[in-house]
Structures are given as structure tokens and as C-alpha cells.
Design a protein with these regions (language model features):
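Short coil/turn and helix-start
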Residues: 1-5, 19, 37-41, 55, ...
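Intrinsically disordered, low-complexity repeat tracts
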Residues: 2-8, 12-24, 31, 63, ...
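Hydrophobic face of amphipathic alpha-helices that form TPR/SEL1-like repeat modules
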Residues: 3, 26-35, 64-71, 75, ...
Length: 209
């Protein structure tokens, strides 16, 4: 299989660079271990590789290690450790880390609850074009979550930006706004279009519609 051969070749290149303590390749090896691409799936090894690269200051690995601690992937679940590593990456402007850390702020997971900071982080990640953050911020505006004034047109605009990048949840949410005419002019054809794109990704709400 050509894909498997390419994966194996990539792993070999990552290994050679990792032996020279090149942090991006160490993190890439970690991802291969986490996903089982070109290497047997080994989540504890993935977390260990992320840690090695994270301790070298590599932002992508810091975010991935934080996510491992958040979800218990290859390590015991530890929200406080998750916050430590996500914070390091977020301070360097890593959009996924800011988005994940915003959820910790909202939930008080591994840290003191801080909705104001959570919104600030979510906004920054959304402004950088990170689709899940745009979708989540849209959800906040649609429902008036976390002290935000409800703004359906703002929600629709954020969902659209996220949906156009392929975010299935945003596609479904945007479809709902078009279906009900909330924040946008009602348009059944556009509603169907966005529901269909969401359903193609097997997103439950999109499938339901």
C-alpha cells in the first residue's frame, strides 16, 4: 500500500531528525504513535515523546501534551497538568491551546473558574482563524453564554467562518440559523446545504436534519 509506505518513510525521516534532538520531529513521532500511522499505536509513548519535545519549548508539543492530560491519553487524566502545558503554548499564541484553555477557564477544570479570561482566550483563537474556536464563540453569542449579550447575527458570522473551513458543528449550527431565520434571512435551501455538509461528516445534528 502506497500510503503505508509513505508513512513508514516519514517515520524514518522523523526518527533521524529526532536523534539529533530536533523537537518538531520528536513531536511528529509522538503523533505517529498516538494515531498508529507508520508505527504501532502506543499512546503512553506518544505522551512521552510530546513531553520531551514540550520540555524543549516546542509549542505544538506543549499543546498536545496538555490535551493528553486533559483527556487521559497515554497518561493519567490530570487537569492541573493540562492547564500548565496549555498555558505555555497559549502564551506563545498557539490557537488550539488557547481554545482548549478557554474551556478549562469556563469549567474551572484544573484552575479557578474565570469566564472573562475564557472569553478573551476564545476570541484570540477565533481571530486567528481557528475553526473550533470560531464555532464555540458563535455558540456563546447565539445563547448569551458566559456573560455575553446574545447576538444572533454575530453568531451566524462566526459559524460561517468556521463552517467554510469544514467544521461540522458550525455547519449544523449555521444550518439551524438559516432554517429558523435567526440572525440571517430565512433560507431553506442554504439550511439544507449546510445540514448536508455537516451530515457528510457524520455529525449527529446534521444527520438528524
Amino acid at each position: 500500500d502506497g500510503v503505508e509506505a509513505d508513512d513508514a518513510k516519514a517515520v524514518e525521516l522523523y526518527r533521524r531528525a529526532a536523534e539529533q534532538d530536533y523537537a518538531p520531529s520528536i513531536a511528529s513521532l509522538g503523533l505517529c504513535c498516538e494515531l498508529g500511522q507508520g508505527l504501532p499505536e502506543d499512546k503512553p509513548k506518544a505522551a512521552a515523546l510530546y513531553r520531551k519535545a514540550a520540555e524543549m519549548g516546542y509549542t505544538y508539543a506543549q499543546c498536545n501534551l496538555g490535551f493528553c492530560y486533559l483527556r487521559g491519553i497515554g497518561v493519567d487524566r490530570d487537569p492541573a497538568q493540562a492547564v500548565i502545558w496549555l498555558q505555555k503554548a497559549a502564551e506563545k499564541g498557539q490557537s488550539r491551546a488557547m481554545s482548549l484553555l478557554s474551556r478549562c477557564c469556563f469549567d474551572g477544570s484544573g484552575m479557578q473558574k474565570d469566564e472573562k479570561r475564557g472569553l478573551e482566550l476564545l476570541r484570540r483563537a477565533a481571530e486567528q482563524g481557528y475553526a473550533p474556536a470560531q464555532c464555540n464563540l458563535g455558540l456563546c453569542y447565539e445563547n448569551g453564554f458566559h456573560g455575553l449579550a446574545q447576538d444572533l447575527s454575530k453568531a451566524a458570522e462566526l459559524y460561517r467562518r468556521s463552517a467554510e473551513q469544514g467544521d461540522a458543528a458550525a455547519q449544523s449550527n449555521l444550518g439551524s440559523l438559516y432554517y429558523t431565520g435567526s440572525g440571517v434571512e430565512r433560507d431553506d435551501a442554504l439550511a439544507f446545504q449546510w445540514f448536508s455538509r455537516s451530515a457528510e461528516q457524520d455529525f449527529p445534528a446534521g444527520v438528524y436534519h
